[in-house]
Every structure is written in structure tokens, then in C-alpha cells.
Amino acid sequence: MAQVKEQNPAPAQNRASDNSGEKRPRTRRPYYSRRPRRPQQPKEAAVPIHIYPLGGLGEVGKNMTVYECCGDMIIVDCGLVFPDSDMFGVDMVIPDFTFVVQNKDKIKGLLITHGHEDHIGSIPYLLQKFDLPIYGTRLTCGLIKNKLEEFGLAGKTKFVEIVPRQKIKLGCFTVEPIHVNHSIPDSVAFAIDSPAGTIIQTGDFKIDYTPLACGPTDLTTLSEYGQKGVLALLSDSTNAERPGFTATEQKVAAGVRSLFARAQNKRIIIATFASNIYRVQQIIDLAVEDGRKVAFSGRSMVNNTAMAQELGYMHIPEGTLISVDELNQYPPEQVVLVTTGSQGEPLSALSRMASCSHRQVRVGPGDFIIISAKPIPGNEKSVTKIVNGLLLLGAEVIYAGMYDVPVSGHACQEEQKLMLTLTKPKYFLPVHGEYKQLKKHALTAASLGIPTSNILIAENGSNVILSRDEIKLGEPVTAGAVMVDGLGVGDVGNVVLRDRKHLSEDGLVIIVATVDSKTGQVLAGPDLVSRGFVYVRENESLMDGAQSIVESALDRCVEEHVRDWNSVKTRVREALSSYIYRRTKRSPMILPILMEV
């Protein structure tokens, strides 16, 4: 049998020995057909994002946060805080804008979560530094425009109206507003997407399943971001110490309705935030049910309600609204007056009523007054002062703690847990609260399994650097409190406040003397003037002794040839201060005035 020659032998790995037991020769793959070994690619560096809180940490108010990534910056909120009781003469406190002014060319816009003063109150002062576009929901923009009108800035500012679920492109940032419940309509959280990842800043929020309007908080969108991956969550800590859930706004309507029933045959005066459109609408609806007319008092109340009606957020039946001047034309049981002053503001309408200085309204025994808001921390004394004043005038006053009229606009612990569970953040930064509230919120996050190494309690001025690999702190930036006193912004500092505190406690003694510019000899005086220290006519011996002490101090300066006037003033001040303290155990401010001739 003829043998067939194998012309194309199979590859060695697929061949076996033939029947003869001989192995076939191996064939080598040509060199050029070998696959080159791929060089190992270096791991791509994680893109960082910087978060600079300029306000709102360790305090309730003055909220302002700056984000920076890839050379672009955006700002979220720009609020104020009301002054503490020891900030004499200060009208408000705003953030220090030094850092944002230094980086103004990088800033792509200012995003606002909602229209409360602690989130929008400082905007006019920022716009006086430089122009930038403002992004906010319809009502929020309306409230800001009202504020800017007072500063002549409304026509110069660019507003961009935002809508929940519609994304905004700002440099390298893509921002999506997310609807949340709060005590004011049109409140949003922000999902801030950048090359570093997605950060969610909640703004002020609560989870109300039966809100008055606008629908519940958008838990679906928050959950979707949680499924995609959230780099960090910055969440409202105001009620971090309160267990359970925040009560629904529906509860307020029931509470106020019961108070209306108690106020039969009386005039009703209700104080609330001018920006709390929900609450004002509830009051209007109840007044209509009760057959009462409604009037507004307080500039911000009048302006905000007019704007809310114009934008369709408030509905007042025709014939219901009257002016404050018309109140006395109706019987007390037929009117409701909605006013500002729920926080004890000295110049508010309710404060002027309590001090009998309101031009149109006189409070008396026929009035039923409801303060429909809890005092912001630090305002308790001011509110108490107003309550006492109203009670002394004979009015019946309902305030926080007596009935469940105020309902918080902030999430309690269970709502905070739900926010953390839905968003599943890698890193967590509690914001918007005093340190004890931030700390408690951090503990809540840790109880849900977030590693403590991924939780950071920052401070105003911190430089928080986030990436997919780590969270760390960089060099801090300039941050602080700038005090506004009348038209002065930043010209009142700690030294001025210390002097004002000193004056308020112990008063002032002024020393006036005329001296020879060459010899230092006293030519006239010294004369002593007391303001807030003692009444001179009733303390003549004290003041005579003080005058002798000053004369002796000036004579010693002449004898010792002291010619430096600052040194002379210091000696006089020290001598008189020591004498007054020995006699009275008080330390008034002493101001020597030496006039050279």
C-alpha cells in the first residue's frame, strides 16, 4: 500500500507520536508573530476636590461653602447670623469674603438652597465686592431680589432660575437641584458632580410625607445617586440631638385652628418669619374659615407676601386683605394681624407693639397674640423681653413651649439616618449646626457603618480635600465673622466690641485738661465728666477726690519732666483707675484728653 506523505504536519502541541513510535520534529513560531508584552500602565491619579466652609460650622447661621475642582469654583449659600447679646450695636454678622474675593476669577456662580436669611442674608454684601450670577428656584430668586432692591443691586445682578431635576453646567461642575421639604417652599439640595466624584449638600431639609405643597422630599433621586456612588454627603445637623421624626406641617394647621377657637371675640396677632410662606398661607386660610380679615405688618412681611402672591405661591381671596391702617375699622373678632418679630428683633413690628411705639397698632387686653416660631439659639432673651412687654399690656400671649404651634423645618435623627442610608456616601461631613450637633450627627453616621476615618467634623476656614482614595485637611483659608453696624461693614472688631461691653458695664469717665506744650504745666482743669458711671451731683466727694488724684498725677509728670503725652495719659489713667476701684470696686473706661497750648 502506497504511503501518503504528510505535507502540512500539525502543530507540536496537537501531535502525538505515530504508530512507529517516532516523534515528529517541532516547528517554531516565527519571531515576528510573537505577541509583545504590554508595559504595565501607571495607576491614574485621583482628581481631588476642595471644600472650603466659610460659615455654618460650629454655629447656626452664616452658611457659606465653596467648592473647587480643576481650577473652577462654585459657592453654595451666602447667609448671615444674628448677633449675640454681647455684640453691642451690631445689626448682623456675615462671613469674611477675603478668600472668595481673592479667587473671584475662578468662581462660576452662587447656588442658593432656599430663601431663609441664614442662607441669603449676606448676598448684598458679597455683590458689593464683585458681580457673579445667582442660581436659585423661583421663590428663592424672588426673595433675593427683594433684598437687593434695598441696596440698589437688583437690576445689576444676573439671576438664573433653576428647577429640580434639571442639571446646570458650571465649569467642570454639573449640579442637579433635588427637591427637599423645609419650612419654606422651593427648597433644594444639590448633587454636585465633578471629575472627583459626586457630592450631595442637603441644605436645610426634613422628610415630610404629608407636606402642605410641593410634594415630599425627592427620595427617589437621592436613592439613585446612592446607587451610582456618592463621594461625600454634607448634611443638615440642626436637630441631630432630637430622636425620631420631625412633625409634619399639617400639625401646625391643627394647632393654630385650636388657638383660633380660643380667641373668639378677640383680635388675633400672629408673629412668624416673613419668609415662611407656608405658615402665612395657613393663617390666611384659617382666617377665611373664621370670617376674619387679614393685615400684614413689618416691611419684610409686606414685601414677601406681595412677591409670593405675584409668583403664585400665595393665594388670598378677594376682599380678605386689608391694610394695617384699616384694622380699627373692624371689630377685634373680625381681624388677624400677621407680623414680623418672632425672634425678638429690636426693630420688628412686634417689638414696637410691645414697647408701645408702633404707629398703627396698640396692644391691650382684647388681643390674643401667637408667636409661631421657636427662638433661634441666642434670641431667647430678646423673645422673652417682648413676651413680658405684651403681657404687661394685658394681652394673652402664646409662645414656644406652651402649645405645639411651631414645627421645625429640620430633620431629626431618623430622617438623618434615612438620608445617609439612601445616599450611601463614602465620606460624611456634618454641617449646619453648633459643635455638639455636628458631633452627634457624626456619631449617628458611625452607627450606620460609615468608618470613623471617613467622617470629618470640619471648622469654618478648613480646607477639606477629597478624592476617591482619601480625605484630608490642607492649609486653612481665611474665614471669620464680619460685623455689620449700620452702614459700616467690618469696621467693628473685637476691640470695639470689648470697649462697648466695658462701657455698658461700668460707664465712662472723661478727663479734660489744658497743658503748656513746653513745660507740661496744667493751665486749665482738670475737669471730669461721668457718663454711665455715677451721677456727679450725688457723688461729689468721690469726684472731688478723683480730681485731686488727676492733679497729683499731672504734677508728678511735670516734676519728672515727662513730655511724651501718651506716657502722661497712661499715668493719669492708671492713677485714677486705681483710686476709683478702691472707692467703688468698679472699673469704668477712663479717657484722658490733654489739649496743648
Language-model regions, residue ranges each:
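Intrinsically disordered, low-complexity RNA-associated tracts
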Residues: M1-A45
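His/Asp/Glu-rich metal-coordinating catalytic cores
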Residues: R28-L111, H116-Y330, S348-R362, K381-K385
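A glycine- and charged-residue-rich anion-binding loop/surface
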Residues: L57, V81-D91, P95, K106-I107, ...
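Short glycine-rich phosphate-binding loop at a beta-alpha junction
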Residues: P133, L429, L591
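Conserved hydrophobic residues forming the short capping helix/wall of the S-adenosyl-L-methionine
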Residues: L148, A445, I580
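Short Gly/Ser/Thr- and Asp/Glu-enriched loop/turn motifs at secondary-structure junctions
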Residues: V163, E459, R586-I590
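Hard-cation-handling environments
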Residues: R242-S372, I376-G545, I549-H561, K569, ...
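C-terminal tails and terminal domains of large nucleic-acid-associated
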Residues: H561-V597
